[in-house]
């Protein structure tokens, strides 16, 4: 990771880490629910999605503060999806980010409700953002696109396709389609939302959308590679968990070398789309290299 990106990440990851639990503290809801919500929000993580939004805003020379609430709302939705993914009925994982998963601490019922609460509260947070208070059309766009990215035609639909793809060998295209929705749609939204807040042109929005799709794909390819040859201590979960869940992965379909070649191809395509956008691309280019080269 280059020094500029590292500095940006460190500064704003700390800000996001501190800000996320602050939204929950004053909610008029049972303490157990607040504790369960906060537990997973404070479990750490790369914060790639909120940082993508903030890096996009920065590239258009817009104030970072304008996007902080939205960035945190996206992370709440991502966190809800992880809580539910870890449940016994889904991936049945006991650890996440090096800690016991939510249902191991609070029980399955409370974990489900904590996820539900994070999902629904995120939309309340977006509609009360100062940055869109005087622009209802922009708020509507942001909410509609987030609902689409995280709902039945996006992340949830991708999760269903992933479950239905277990215990059978998928084609590479089927796997790409699953991860386009399961992982890529929310990543793409993070970038597009930053551009919408920055009043980007339709041409720039389209190039950023294509960049984001490629970035989401290479993010998942890298995840699959790390599941084969990563360090479980750095990953915060057991290596080889996908094999244990009988899931098709890029290495299982293409071999490890084939998956790495595919990673290189989509990294190049992502950069080509980004180069067409009229903005300061420094951070997003560096972030692309980071996603492709990360070790966790």
List the predicted regions and their residue ranges.
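N-terminal leader/targeting segments and the immediately adjacent pre-domain N-terminus
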Residues: 1-18
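Mg2+-dependent prenyl diphosphate-binding active-site environment of isoprenoid biosynthetic enzymes
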Residues: 12-14, 21-24, 28-274, 279-292
């Amino acid at each position: 990771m280059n020094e500029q990106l590292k500095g940006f990440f460190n500064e704003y990851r700390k800000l996001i880490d501190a800000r996320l639990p602050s939204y929950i503290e004053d909610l008029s809801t049972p303490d157990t629910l607040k504790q369960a919500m906060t537990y997973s929000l404070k479990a750490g993580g790369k914060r790639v999605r909120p940082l993508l939004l903030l890096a996009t805003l920065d590239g258009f020379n817009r104030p970072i503060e304008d996007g902080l609430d939205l960035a945190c709302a996206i992370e709440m939705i991502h966190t809800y999806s992880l809580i539910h993914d870890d449940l016994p009925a889904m991936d049945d994982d006991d650890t996440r980010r090096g800690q016991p998963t939510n249902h191991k601490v609070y029980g399955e019922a409370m974990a489900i409700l904590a996820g539900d609460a994070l999902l629904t509260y995120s939309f309340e947070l977006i509609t009360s953002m100062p940055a869109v208070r005087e622009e209802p059309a922009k708020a509507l766009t942001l909410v509609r696109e987030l609902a689409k990215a995280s709902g039945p035609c996006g992340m949830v639909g991708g999760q269903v396709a992933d479950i239905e793809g277990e215990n059978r060998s998928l084609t590479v295209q089927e796997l790409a389609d699953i991860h386009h929705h399961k992982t890529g749609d929310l990543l793409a939204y993070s970038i597009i939302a930053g551009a919408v807040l920055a009043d980007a042109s339709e041409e720039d929005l389209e190039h950023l959308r294509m960049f984001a799709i490629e970035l989401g794909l290479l993010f998942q390819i890298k995840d699959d590679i790390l599941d084969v040859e990563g360090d479980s201590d750095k990953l915060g979960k057991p290596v080889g968990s996908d094999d244990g869940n009988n899931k098709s992965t890029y290495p299982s379909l293409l071999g490890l070398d084939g998956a790495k070649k595919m990673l290189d191809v989509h990294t190049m395509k992502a950069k080509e789309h980004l180069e067409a956008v009229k903005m300061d691309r420094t951070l997003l280019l560096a972030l692309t290299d980071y996603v492709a080269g990360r070790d966790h």
